[in-house]
Amino acid sequence: MSKVYTNFTVKGLTEQLNKGKVIVYPTESVFGLGCNPDNENAINTLLKIKCRSWKKGLILVAANYTQLFKYVDDRYLNSLQLSRIFSTWPGPFTWVFPARSSTPMWLTGKFSSVAIRVSNFEPIRRLCLTFGKPLVSTSANVSGYLPARTIHAVYKQLGYDFPIMNTNVLGLPNPSIIRDAITGKIIRK
């Protein structure tokens, strides 16, 4: 019989992240699956749960831009591009930045870039601040299925065996907009 997790506190979720677990938490629009971006085993578990190819790359969500320095190489962006990006943060906007050469392929996928977001949603901010770094963030669903907007939908698609922050999603109608940091081109609406 698998263990059934109950509602975890931020501290409890941080402990689970440090143990290499995949967690479920609310985002601005849907429930997310998250894990430690520096733990390849955790990433592989997350990808297996979602039935998602590593080649697609993953999003990192953070409490502030400083938490993302380790992963992005913003030398390729000018002050106007950075100003445009920073005017959308914190908020539900994801930007695809050039990745540092040290950023692992399990985050970038087949690309030389990494998708990042600085959230203003308090549960995510508290979690990232307590954890001390960003989280991998992807919708809590099997690839090809609708993202889960309720805990019941998470359980129905993925089962019960996850540490969960059972707090409501913010309620935005769509997942974050994704744009290319250099060109400004919309990648996902």
Swiss-Prot record:
It holds the Pfam family Sua5_yciO_yrdC. It comes from the Bacteria. It catalyses: L-threonine + hydrogencarbonate + ATP = L-threonylcarbamoyladenylate + diphosphate + H2O. One of its GO terms (molecular function) is ATP binding. Keywords: ATP-binding, Cytoplasm, Nucleotide-binding, Nucleotidyltransferase, Transferase, tRNA processing. Its main location: cytoplasm. Residues 7-189 form the YrdC-like domain. One of its GO terms (cellular component) is cytoplasm. It is found in: Cytoplasm. It is an enzyme of class 2 (transferase). Its EC number is 2.7.7.87. GO terms for biological process: regulation of translational fidelity; tRNA threonylcarbamoyladenosine modification. InterPro entries: DHBP_synth_RibB-like_a/b_dom, Sua5-like_dom, TC-AMP_synthase, TC-AMP_synthase_SUA5. Belongs to the SUA5 family. TsaC subfamily. Required for the formation of a threonylcarbamoyl group on adenosine at position 37 (t(6)A37) in tRNAs that read codons beginning with adenine. Catalyzes the conversion of L-threonine, HCO(3)(-)/CO(2) and ATP to give threonylcarbamoyl-AMP (TC-AMP) as the acyladenylate intermediate, with the release of diphosphate. PANTHER family: SUA5 (PTHR17490), THREONYLCARBAMOYL-AMP SYNTHASE (PTHR17490:SF18). This is Threonylcarbamoyl-AMP synthase. It comes from Blochmanniella floridana. The lineage of its organism: Bacteria, Pseudomonadati, Pseudomonadota, Gammaproteobacteria, Enterobacterales.
